[in-house]
Structure formats: C-alpha cells, structure tokens
C-alpha cells in the first residue's frame, strides 16, 4: 500500500526527469531526428519501459503516481486500475497494489479466439476505472483502451501517464471534452530543464529541443517530418 508521502509536484517532476536521464531512458538528437509513429520528426525520444528494470526508481515513480492520483482525483474515486497492452500493464499492477485496488488490462484488440476478450481480469458493470499508460502525447492511444472499457460497461473519468509530452496545448482540453481528466508526473520541459542544469548537451542541441517543444509540428516539417497530425 501507498506510504502517504505527498511530495511536492515540482519536486516529483524534477526527480522523475533526473531518473530518466540516469537510466538513459531519454535522448536528444537534433542533428538526426527520430521519426515517431505519427510521422513527426522529433529531436527527443523516450523509452519509459526501461523504468521497470530499475527497482528503486520504479518504486519511487509509482509512489509519485499514487500521490498524484490521490491528491488530484481523490482517495475513494476508483474501483479498478487498468493498464493498456503492453507498456501499461506492469505499471497498472504496481499502481493497483499501492492503491489497494483490483487490476485489469486491456488489449489493443479482441484476441480473436476463445472468449474473444479485449479486457482481461474482472471488471464489474459500472466500475470506476483509472487508466494508466507509461506515456502519452495527445491521448489518442489511451482512448483506444478507454473506449473499450466504456463499451464493456466501465466508467472512465481519469487517466494517468507517468510521462506526458505536453507539446500540444489542445491535448488536455480534447481529453476533457471526451470526459477524461489527464494526470501526469513529468514532461519534456522537466527533462530539458535537468539537461540544461547538468549541461548534458551543447547549447545548440538544447535550443533545438526547446524550439521543438515550443512549435513541434513546425520543427517536424522543417526537419523532414509531417507538419500536421491526423485527428485523434
């Protein structure tokens, strides 16, 4: 169960950013941009899955996730924690343990044989479900799982991402318009702040990353990626 240590939000964000650098889960590469699944060119890349391999770090991050949810959403607002296939599953298990709640996981699509189930585990009709993902950009992937839970009779009004890109100002509003409040611990701006503080890169690289965070689609288009995104 959660230890009830409610660390300040800004401290949590900075610590998670430092942890991500420590385990080399975040990368800056402005001169040879990454190509994201959306088609965007990006000077930044993150692999939150690495967190599960570092017990002390993953424990701290999940304590922060529990604190974020309890403080921002409430103590008695959920009946079930859900993780999306596949990255969200281990984090859902760890968060459910801390919150003292049952856990389910949601497939990207029904498995196509047997019960043809998309949701694994027990979710009562009308259950209030907290959905967790390792990261989200604009919430699109999270809604694939939310829609499946709602179709099966669950109620989803909150989602949490351990890491939120926070590069599209309209993203949280779009999620809110679909009935979901998004909670998160750290963003790219926290990661950039740590990189500047620790002088991890030259000034040109840091400035390119900041330019991307300020205008991601314009930066993408200038660097060979798409300049618009498909509607979420």
From Swiss-Prot:
The keyword Phosphoprotein does not apply. CDD domains: PRTases_typeI. 5-phospho-alpha-D-ribose 1-diphosphate binds at residues 107-108, 111, 113, 133-141. Its EC number is 2.4.2.10. Keywords: Glycosyltransferase, Magnesium, Pyrimidine biosynthesis, Transferase. It is an enzyme of class 2 (transferase). It holds the Pfam family Pribosyltran. Orotate binds at residue 137. InterPro entries: OPRT, Or_phspho_trans_dom, PRibTrfase_dom, PRTase-like. Pathway: Pyrimidine metabolism; UMP biosynthesis via de novo pathway; UMP from orotate: step 1/2. GO terms for molecular function: magnesium ion binding; orotate phosphoribosyltransferase activity. GO terms for biological process: 'de novo' UMP biosynthetic process; pyrimidine nucleobase biosynthetic process. Its cofactor is Mg(2+). Homodimer. Catalyzes the transfer of a ribosyl phosphate group from 5-phosphoribose 1-diphosphate to orotate, leading to the formation of orotidine monophosphate (OMP). This is Orotate phosphoribosyltransferase. The lineage of its organism: Bacteria, Pseudomonadati, Pseudomonadota, Alphaproteobacteria, Hyphomicrobiales. The gene is pyrE.
């Amino acid at each position: 169960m959660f230890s009830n240590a409610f660390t300040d939000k800004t401290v949590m964000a900075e610590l998670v950013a430092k942890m991500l650098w420590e385990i080399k889960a975040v990368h800056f590469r402005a001169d040879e941009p990454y190509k994201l699944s959306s088609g965007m060119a990006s000077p930044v890349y993150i692999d939150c899955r690495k967190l599960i391999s570092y017990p002390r770090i993953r424990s701290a991050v999940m304590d922060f996730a529990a604190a974020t949810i309890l403080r921002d959403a409430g103590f008695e607002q959920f009946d079930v924690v859900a993780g999306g296939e596949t990255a969200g599953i281990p984090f859902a298990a760890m968060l459910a343990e801390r919150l003292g709640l049952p856990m389910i996981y949601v497939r990207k699509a029904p498995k196509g044989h047997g019960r043809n189930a998309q949701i694994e585990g027990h979710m009562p009709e009308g259950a209030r479900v907290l959905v967790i993902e390792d990261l989200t950009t604009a919430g699109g992937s999270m809604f694939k799982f939310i829609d499946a839970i709602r179709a099966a009779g669950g109620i989803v009004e909150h989602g949490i991402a351990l890491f939120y890109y926070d590069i599209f100002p309209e993203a949280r509003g779009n999620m809110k318009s679909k009935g979901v409040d998004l909670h998160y611990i750290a963003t790219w701006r926290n990661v950039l702040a740590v990189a500047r503080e620790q002088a991890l890169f030259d000034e040109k690289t840091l400035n390119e990353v900041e330019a991307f965070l300020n205008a991601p689609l314009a930066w993408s288009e200038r660097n060979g990626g798409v300049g618009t995104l498909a509607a979420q």
